[in-house]
């Protein structure tokens, strides 16, 4: 009884701490929360468990971009990632296996499809020529409608070069994805499939989809302006079909180089934008026409050669990759530029000029396809 009175007066715990008459102590009750050692040290007793340490919650690793607010203030080019969780593998090298084979397979399919596309285009040009003659004859006998919106659109479309017509579809796709970023209910889906990150659960498809993804209007406008400016030159060099294959392959290859750099340095984070593919276009044109003159849009007075511009860009991206600058994905830029230089120097001879076996196989399929009617002769 003396012990019970001392506990009640000194610890202020009530009768729950009193010993039973039969000796020993009964189990502690959690109906009251005893206070020990003043206000700063509160221990809550669990029933039938004594003093048990609360289990520690293990949280998955988040993107290595500092705090969410700091990352968003530092760069407006990436989407907000407050609720995004990434899962880096305990064996980082293994995460590169699937992207590596995806890069090889997609590049092969892109160039194979471009070769078949070119074959079909050449085959349909004769028919298109006669269709054009017929259309001109019909236009000559039909009464012309002044101020027709469709006529004005056709006139504008016909005034574009082949390169500008080709990149118009690419620009439209980028604009569509940019609009999807503005839909709040699609944020998680967009971050998962339209940003590339080796710590994400989805590795392969974002390597292509992120090439058409921009979160910032300024980022998209700058990339599309550069693409539009170099579109005529690159299509004149490669042709429409080969350019599309190079552009899509460059987006995947530049993202794979970015994956390798992020895994090697341990600096995981999402990337998006067409900069890697556009760097391939820029590097290809500058390598093919190194004496060409370029200028900055806001400083047209200062001009420089394309060769010097390419050297400066490669030097800046190399420094950014080594020093760990986070505003741009310098590894993707550098990978795209090196791919553009390699393709103009060697890739065109190794890949595009060896497409004839595939074209012959496709020609045989188109010519000797399954005959209608069947039956024996």
Swiss-Prot record:
Ranges facing Mitochondrial intermembrane side: 120-165, 229-242, 288-293, 353-377
Entry-linked Pfam families: Rhomboid
Function: Required for the control of apoptosis during postnatal growth. Essential for proteolytic processing of an antiapoptotic form of OPA1 which prevents the release of mitochondrial cytochrome c in response to intrinsic apoptotic signals. Required for the maturation of PINK1 into its 52kDa mature form after its cleavage by mitochondrial-processing peptidase (MPP). Promotes cleavage of serine/threonine-protein phosphatase PGAM5 in damaged mitochondria in response to loss of mitochondrial membrane potential.
Residue ranges, Mitochondrial matrix side: 51-99, 186-205, 261-270, 317-330
Active site feature: 275 (nucleophile), 333
Effects seen without this gene: Mice develop normally until 4 weeks of age. They show subsequent progressive growth retardation, atrophy of muscle, spleen, and thymus as well as severe apoptosis of T and B lymphocytes leading to premature death between 8-12 weeks of age. Mouse embryonic fibroblasts lacking Parl show high susceptibility to intrinsic apoptotic signals. This defect can be complemented by Parl or a soluble form of Opa1.
Protein name listed in UniProt: Presenilin-associated rhomboid-like protein, mitochondrial
């Amino acid at each position: 009884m003396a012990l019970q009175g001392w506990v009640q007066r000194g610890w202020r715990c009530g009768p729950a701490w009193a010993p039973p008459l039969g000796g020993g102590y009964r189990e502690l009750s959690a109906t009251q929360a005893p206070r020990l050692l003043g206000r700063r040290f509160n221990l809550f007793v669990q029933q039938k468990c004594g003093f048990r340490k609360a289990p520690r919650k293990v949280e998955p690793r988040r993107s290595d971009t500092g705090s969410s607010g700091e990352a968003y203030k530092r760069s407006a080019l990436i989407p907000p990632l407050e609720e995004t969780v990434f899962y880096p593998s305990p064996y980082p090298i293994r995460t590169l296996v699937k992207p590596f084979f995806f890069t090889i397979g997609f590049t092969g399919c892109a160039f194979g499809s471009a070769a078949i596309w070119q074959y079909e285009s050449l085959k349909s040009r004769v028919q298109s020529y006669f269709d054009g003659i017929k259309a001109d004859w019909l236009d000559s006998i039909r009464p012309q409608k002044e101020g027709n919106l469709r006529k004005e659109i056709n006139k504008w479309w016909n005034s574009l070069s082949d390169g500008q017509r080709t990149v118009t579809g690419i620009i439209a796709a980028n604009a569509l994805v940019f609009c999807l970023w503005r839909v709040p209910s699609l944020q998680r889906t967009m971050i998962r499939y339209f940003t590339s990150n080796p710590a994400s659960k989805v590795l392969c498809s974002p390597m292509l989809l992120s090439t058409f993804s921009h979160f910032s209007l300024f980022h998209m406008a700058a990339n599309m302006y550069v693409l539009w400016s170099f579109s005529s030159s690159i299509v004149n060099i490669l042709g429409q079909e080969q350019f599309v294959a190079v552009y899509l392959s460059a987006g995947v290859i530049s993202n794979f180089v970015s994956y390798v750099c992020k895994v090697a340095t341990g600096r995981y984070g999402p990337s998006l934008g067409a900069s890697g593919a556009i760097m391939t276009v820029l590097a290809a044109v500058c390598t093919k026409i190194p004496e060409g003159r370029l200028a900055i849009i806001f400083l047209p007075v200062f001009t420089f050669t394309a060769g010097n511009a390419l050297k400066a860009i490669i030097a800046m991206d190399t420094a950014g990759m080594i020093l760990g600058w986070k505003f741009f994905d310098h590894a993707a830029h550098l990978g795209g530029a090196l791919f553009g230089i390699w393709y103009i120097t060697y890739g065109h001879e190794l890949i595009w000029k060896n497409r004839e076996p595939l074209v012959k196989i496709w020609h045989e399929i188109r010519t000797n396809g399954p005959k209608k009617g069947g039956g024996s002769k």
